[in-house]
Amino acid sequence: FNPALYKLTATLNSGKQSEKKQVQFGMRDFKIEGKWFYVNGRKTMLRGTVENCDFPLTGYAPMDVASWERVFRICRNYGLNHMRFHSFCPPEAAFIAADLVGFYLQPEGPSWPNHGPRLGNGQPIDKYLMDETIALTKEYGNYASYCMLACGNEPSGRWVAWVSKFVDYWKATDPRRVYTGASVGNSWQWQPHNEYHVKAGARGL
């Protein structure tokens, strides 16, 4: 997308004390109608890639805006317009850079809950993923590039009921983006509360 960014400055004065807060943000409408994504009423085809949190030289994701700007500009040069973050949420620098470049993001809750922990069985992972996605949305929810959310990757357990509640919670709580229960591989079943579906091997779907 072609970003138009705004800065809001709020100042609180109380006697001799003064506090100022400035926030940069964008305004956009991101929704689904039928089988299509629409951005500000315009039918939009998403062409994306996945970031697997693989940063072997540092062991962690870049924390500076310039590094993420470089990544997103390279992606745009190849005709891509969105990125899924596999089982993690990138640092704030990624959202800032995506807003500057014009790139759609899908962060996820930090879990791949089929290697021990399982969703919907009353394990700590259930509350943990809700707490984490609430926290990341509270922190980064005003960034226009934050358009999609999943609880994590390829769940197991009684996951269909759990991710259905997850999607229902977010649709009712924050309509600024669209939601899917979890990003899944080739053989996971459809979860009917999803607003969209993330699936590997999309060609021939």
Where are these regions (language model features)?
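Substrate-binding/catalytic cleft of secreted carbohydrate-active enzymes
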Residues: 73, 82-205
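Secreted/periplasmic carbohydrate-active enzymes, especially glycoside hydrolases
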Residues: 1-86, 97, 101-102, 132, ...
